[in-house]
């Protein structure tokens, strides 16, 4: 069994593979945030073990950037753990040299999953996520219309004071 910690970023994610003993396997892997990048990532993992079911994945909830790789891995039937960044930050505090970079972050995420000391973040299905996004967009548009009405009335009152 291998644990893969993925540090999420806007353009390029960083992944570290760890065995159950806590030792890193190979070098960290850069993953472009594209479907081609995800396929290349899976190919690199298959060089370690041909059976993708021997890998468990962990990632932090970071904006919306984690959704694409999460969906890709879930569609492959992989076990994907989504954690709150606060949980990995607490483990980071145990290390003597507390420098922060993507490679170390991905290894820490893998270690959090390996140790099992995390609370899983629930992930809604695609329809619920789409509905959430539409609802947020509607609230944004309603606020914008209200703001434009207020600004228009202010201008009318200034131009035509009577």
Question: Over which residues does each language-model region extend?
Answer:
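Short glycine-rich, Thr/Ser-proximal phosphate-binding strand/loop in the N-terminal lobe
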Residues: 9-36
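Long, charge-rich intrinsically disordered scaffolds of nucleic-acid metabolism proteins
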Residues: 81-162
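Acidic active-site catalytic centers that drive phospho-/nucleotidyl reactions
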Residues: 7, 60, 102-105
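Anion (oxyanion) recognition and catalysis
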Residues: 74
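Gly/Thr-rich phosphate-binding beta-strand-loop-beta motif of the actin/hexokinase/Hsp70
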Residues: 1-19, 109, 141
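Short glycine-rich phosphate-binding loop at a beta-alpha junction
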Residues: 53-62
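Short, basic/hydrophobic alpha-helical segments
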Residues: 37-54
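Short, well-ordered alpha-helical microsegments
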Residues: 65-69
């Amino acid at each position: 069994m291998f644990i893969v910690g993925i540090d999420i970023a806007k353009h390029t994610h960083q992944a570290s593979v760890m065995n159950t003993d806590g030792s890193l396997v190979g070098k960290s892997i850069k993953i472009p945030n594209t479907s081609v990048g995800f396929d290349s990532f899976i190919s690199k993992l298959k060089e370690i073990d041909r059976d993708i079911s021997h890998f468990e994945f962990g990632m932090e909830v970071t904006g919306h950037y984690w959704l694409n790789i999460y969906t890709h891995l879930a569609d492959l039937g992989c076990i994907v753990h989504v954690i709150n960044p606060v949980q990995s930050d607490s483990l980071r505090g145990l290390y003597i040299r507390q420098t922060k970079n993507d490679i170390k972050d991905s290894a820490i995420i893998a270690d959090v999953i390996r140790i099992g000391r995390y609370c899983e973040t629930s992930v809604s299905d695609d329809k619920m996520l789409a509905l959430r996004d539409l609802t947020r967009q509607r609230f944004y548009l309603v606020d914008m219309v209200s703001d434009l009405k207020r600004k228009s009335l202010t201008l009318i009152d200034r131009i035509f004071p009577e």
